Amino acid sequence: ASELARSRGKRAGVAVALSLAAVTSVPALAADTVVQAGETVNGGTLTNHDNQIVFGTANGMTISTGLEYGPDNEANTGGQWIQNGGIANNTTVTGGGLQRVNAGGSVSDTVISAGGGQSLQGQAVNTTLNGGEQWVHEGGIATVTVINEKGWQAVKSGAMATDTVVNTGAEGGPDAENGDTGQNVYGDAVRTTINKNGRQIVAAEGTANTTVVYAGGDQTVHGHALDTTLNGGYQYVHNGGTASGTVVNSDGWQIIKEGGLADFTTVNQKGKLQVNAGGTATHVTLKQGGALVTSTAATVLGSNRLGNFTVENGKADGVVLESGGRLDVLEGHSAQKTRVDDGGTLAVSAGGKATDVTMTSGGALIADSGATVEGTNASGKFSIDGISGQASGLLLENGGSFTVNAGGQAGNTTVGHRGTLTLAAGGSLSGRTQLSKGASMVLNGDVVSTGDIVNAGEIHFDNQTTQDAVLSRAVAKGDSPVTFHKLTTTNLTGQGGTINMRVRLDGSNTSDQLVINGGQATGKTWLAFTNVGNSNLGVATTGQGIRVVDAQNGATTEEGAFALSRPLQAGAFNYTLNRDSDEDWYLRSENAYRAEVPLYASMLTQAMDYDRILAGSRSHQTGVNGENNSVRLSIQGGHLGHDNNGGIARGATPESSGSYGFVRLEGDLLRTEVAGMSLTTGVYGAAGHSSVDVKDDDGSRAGTVRDDAGSLGGYLNLVHTSSGLWADIVAQGTRHSMKASSD
């Protein structure tokens, strides 16, 4: 009533619509219009601060005014006002427009565009927010509102929204508190459907009941969420928020943050429950294939397929980890009877303790030699003694990793696919260390193995060999000091694995080194080198070269035990791997230059040959043929190349063979007779291409040089009239675009 009074006070009077018939058509409304009870108005537009006050029925109105003071401002007085008993159907609200539905009023099928709004204290059914906003005030009920991109529904305290469909709000990324799109609930929201990109934010005083969240959508809970179903969507429960009865289905994810509480959560196959430090989840039902992600700093109580489990007060008991599940046992905390199945991860920090662990195929263990862990895996019993730093029987796979700290030792370790074994300086190996295909061992210092290393995976020195270095043909930045390391082992059996080593090829002749101490190197191991020196300054090696494999104390290395995994080049040199009679292996520079050197040496000659042929082509056109045309077009092609005249080492042009072709257009500017001589001047332009195959000094193919050329020139032609003698003077400039491709 107060809003109506303000509306009426806006102008001197109110124009009352005539009610001569039950239905009145109003093609153009007056400034203020009242639709009386029992009256129906079809169509019309509200603009320029107009009012329509509806006690009867208004159909098909377009509203473009009313938000003079901004969104959801009680000072707004224009637009369409639906009063107690009033009805509005099929209304369109455009930018700047306002539809106000007071208590007792009802609207249906309203479409609100960006910049428009609906203020609701009555009832609204089938509202569509196409970038527009709906403000549901105390006592208001919004049913089946569809919130599309950039639309926003605010359900205030004492208000209710039912069967809302949310298609916007999450574009800012997971759990981003943007709050200006999607649905914000301060009152009650029932049976909300949240689709991809949709977001529902439940404020501290709000309640959301029976929400369904699909993939790409999420629900942020600061208040209360009841009976939410996550069908691929996410639910974030923040400090002070509670979620009860959540069902997490495939690809769904419930995250309980510090201070958040979840009760009676059910996690089905491929669903995930994450409880952060300080978060609480009680009465959890974890079905087979469901994932639990938590740490011993959280509180989680419930049941899994093996029975009841608990995580509280720094202790975990009976936890099952699979399908992306993870338990972090923190320093000073403990876990017992943990089962780690396929896709599960048990991470034990230094000072943490995990006993009676069962690791099955596909499970991952993450620890270092400062943790205490004992249990069984696919290979049998395993253990880590956090006091002595001794580990035995570890199986690392599927993201599992173990770090041997200084003074620690790992014995009889198996590293499977996607597993990593890291050794600090002073860490050591014993027994059999097996690296499967896809496994990694990282050496951060000098490491000694007193047993055997069997390698089908990757060994990295200081983890400096990256994919970027591989793509750049094993060249790394040389602007930081490098400390080279040694890996010493009794025996090495190569099973097609790779050892990634660092080397300086700019004169220092130093590298990481593999030492075979008293045993054998057998099988096949690839050596991949990263040049950590100045990649533009390759220096020829001296003596035997750079020793990279050192056979000591009677050790032997099979011929073919090592090979380069990729070309190694620096400056002008190629480097090869060679085995000497002392069983050691060395990097040596080749006497021949690397393939790129003859290619670049050939470029200048190729360009000059082309330029000379193009400039000389002028004589054949006019001097010999005596053409009189002022403009001439010619096409020419032929062979281009050089014989072997001693090679680069003797300063000669590399041997090459190829072809050229060009199109030339020239035009005379002046023709005249001077002192018995015919004088002609003109200009020309040409576009051409040449391609030459280049050979190295040893006769092998080095690659191909291709040249796209554009030329401009001028000429002066003199012909002695009586004798026929002639001369051409040519000035020419050419832009060459050359590309060398080595074999």
PLM features: what roles do these ranges have?
Residues 1-17, 23:
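Bacterial Sec-dependent N-terminal signal peptides
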Residues 17-25, 632-637:
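Short, glycine/alanine-rich hydrophobic alpha-helices that insert into or span membranes
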Residues 26-30:
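Sec/Tat signal peptide C-region and signal peptidase I cleavage site
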Residues 41, 46, 52-54, 58-63, ...:
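Fold-core signature of tandem repeat domains
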Residues 68-76, 171-180, 469-476:
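Intrinsically disordered, low-complexity Ser/Thr- and acidic-rich flexible linkers and loops
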Residues 229, 301-304, 337, 355-381, ...:
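Extracellular beta-solenoid/beta-roll
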